Amino acid sequence: MFRLDELAARLGGDVVGDPATTVRRVATLEQAGEGDLSFLANPKYVGRLKSSHASAIIVADSARSLLGEKAGIVTRDPYLYFARVAQLFNPPEAVAPGVHPLADVAVAVPASVAVAAGASIGAGVELGEDVVIGAGSSIGAGVRIGAGTRLAPRVVIYPGCVIGTNCLIHAGAVIGSDGFGFAREKSGAWVKIPQVGRVVIGDDVEIGANTTIDRGALDDTVIGNGVKIDNQIQIGHNVRIGDYTAIAGCVGIAGSTQIGARCMIGGQAGIIGHLTIADDVVISAGTLVTKSIHKPGVYTANLPVQPHADWVKNFAHLRHLDSLAARIRALEQSPDHPESA
């Protein structure tokens, strides 16, 4: 439980109303009640603010007057402020250090490390202070994991990979499996190319459940600092992702693509291999990227939803674009066309 003036002292912001107002959790404007702290980040929800029963509301300076008699905190970015308050109210679960008797650990680990039942830690592994290894996780030989990193149950880290400090890797993620590398014989048979690179992950990275990041063929696959990767994402071998890029669920990134810093990639986007994407690029959900992107900006290549009957009619026209274009060119070249006179 915090008073508003205590929150402002920790996180900044201007308190409106009674600074001794206490809040015990964060909640949406609709669901908030006595003792709850809510926030208004989007002006279209002003109506919900007016009817909210929250004890206090976080708002931008432009919405200060909307608080009326309600208590609140005024800040430049209400959504970011809400995120920081939510961290205060919901700290990571405390985990007792120690190695479970049913864990298979081949190395000495710091006393502050927690290794759960069924986990396996191979030879030559280096774990930093306060690392947590979840139940059933497998850490291959020679892996290095930085201080404060947490692995949920059943995470697999293949041999030789490097994980930075204060990372969070969710259940079922696989780091360092073989990249998809094969050479083809004249007969059509495939010859596997050994994947001898590593996966190197920076600090403060979060990797979602059931995401797979392939090890490099020769060079490493590299994930920069502060990168946020959602669930069920496939990252191919030799990919390099710049600092603070965020990638939403079900994205596929083919091998040897380089993605810049601070990019945002929407869900189910696909990026083919050997491309370069500049810093500060936003790729809309469902977009297929087939060419390199050299300038910052928002890029979209998909069709918005529409009634099926309309889609069928529009697609019928799409199938005949070549003939329609030829007819237009013929009309433009006709002696009867106004511009040909």
Curated annotation (Swiss-Prot):
Signal sequence coordinates: none
InterPro entries: Hexapep, Hexapep_transf_CS, LpxD, Trimer_LpxA-like_sf, UDP_GlcNAc_AcTrfase_non-rep
Top-level lineage group: Bacteria
Major enzyme class: transferase
Substrates-to-products reaction catalysed: a UDP-3-O-[(3R)-3-hydroxyacyl]-alpha-D-glucosamine + a (3R)-hydroxyacyl-[ACP] = a UDP-2-N,3-O-bis[(3R)-3-hydroxyacyl]-alpha-D-glucosamine + holo-[ACP] + H(+)
GO terms under cellular component: membrane
UniProt-listed HAMAP family: LpxD
Sequence similarity: Belongs to the transferase hexapeptide repeat family. LpxD subfamily.
Listed name of the protein: UDP-3-O-acylglucosamine N-acyltransferase
Lineage: Bacteria, Pseudomonadati, Pseudomonadota, Betaproteobacteria, Rhodocyclales
